């Protein structure tokens, strides 16, 4: 279903409700530059890096698009998805069944879920929706619970410290969204709805947070303008 949520004036903050869930796959593919390509890259790396029957948890799994892709790459993976949106999980369950993917879903706040014993954790554009004051402790929790040599994949929207560059990146990104079929009005409406909901860090801040949590290796494996995918190894 095509994302047309912001064609009309919105008077509430952004939330992952039934309306958003119904168009989420279209929304993220048109809103995050090279989303499918970056997920494909992350999936390829995990397929080559993780042991047989590795346990993977996607924190903020939305409609399970990434988990389903992992299932097709490595059917032996044990896959788990957590999301606090029941509407998202309803679609995720339906999609996973259609693909024959066995995925254990849980409707829960990711800050409170049990993370022990996983070989890999996924945060695909999830951390940016968590209050900044809680992020460091949550990333540290992920690190401490990952198995030895565990991997964290973390995709995030970024901000730039240089004000001129930051303004240029915003303009470039808005031009990108218009090329994806969004009107200037829709872009402005969504930006307003996301104020104080989506709060990005800089690349440096994200790197430092991962290092402070204890990760030995922190690399950016994909980047386009103000979007990046981090890979961190325990």
UniProtKB/Swiss-Prot annotation:
GO MF annotation list: carboxyl- or carbamoyltransferase activity; S-adenosyl-L-methionine binding
List of residues binding S-adenosyl-L-methionine: 35, 60-62, 83-84, 109-110, 124, 191
Sorted UniProt keywords: S-adenosyl-L-methionine, Transferase
Domain of life: Bacteria
Enzyme kind, highest EC tier: transferase
Gene Ontology BP terms: tRNA wobble uridine modification
Catalytic activity annotation: prephenate + S-adenosyl-L-methionine = carboxy-S-adenosyl-L-methionine + 3-phenylpyruvate + H2O
EC number, UniProt record: 2.1.3.-
CDD domains registered for this protein in UniProt: AdoMet_MTases
Assembly and binders: Homodimer.
Family of the protein in this entry: Belongs to the class I-like SAM-binding methyltransferase superfamily. Cx-SAM synthase family.
NCBIfam families: carboxy-S-adenosyl-L-methionine synthase CmoA
Function: Catalyzes the conversion of S-adenosyl-L-methionine (SAM) to carboxy-S-adenosyl-L-methionine (Cx-SAM).
Name by which UniProt lists this protein: Carboxy-S-adenosyl-L-methionine synthase
Native organism: Campylobacter hominis (strain ATCC BAA-381 / DSM 21671 / CCUG 45161 / LMG 19568 / NCTC 13146 / CH001A)
Encoding gene (name): cmoA
């Amino acid at each position: 279903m095509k994302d047309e949520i912001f064609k009309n004036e919105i008077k509430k903050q952004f939330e992952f409700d039934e309306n958003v869930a119904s168009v989420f796959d279209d929304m993220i593919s048109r809103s995050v530059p090279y989303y499918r390509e970056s997920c494909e890259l992350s999936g390829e790396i995990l397929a080559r890096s993780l042991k047989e029957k590795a346990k993977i948890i996607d924190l903020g799994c939305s409609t399970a698009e990434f988990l389903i892709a992992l299932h097709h790459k490595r059917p032996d993976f044990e896959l788990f998805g957590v999301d606090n949106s029941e509407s998202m999980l309803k679609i995720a369950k339906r999609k996973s069944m259609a693909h024959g993917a066995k995925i254990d879903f849980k409707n829960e706040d990711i800050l409170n879920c049990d993370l022990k014993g996983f070989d890999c954790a996924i945060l695909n554009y999830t951390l940016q929706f968590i209050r900044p004051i809680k992020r460091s402790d949550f990333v540290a929790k992920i690190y401490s619970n990952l198995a030895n040599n565990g991997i964290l994949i973390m995709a995030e929207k970024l901000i730039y410290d240089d004000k001129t560059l930051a303004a240029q990146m915003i303009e470039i990104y808005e031009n990108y969204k218009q090329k994806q079929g969004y009107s200037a009005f829709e872009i402005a409406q969504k930006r307003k709805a996301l104020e104080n909901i989506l709060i990005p860090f800089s690349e440096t801040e994200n790197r430092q947070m991962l290092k402070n949590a204890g990760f030995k290796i922190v690399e950016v494996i994909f980047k386009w303008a103000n979007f990046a995918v981090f890979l961190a190894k325990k």
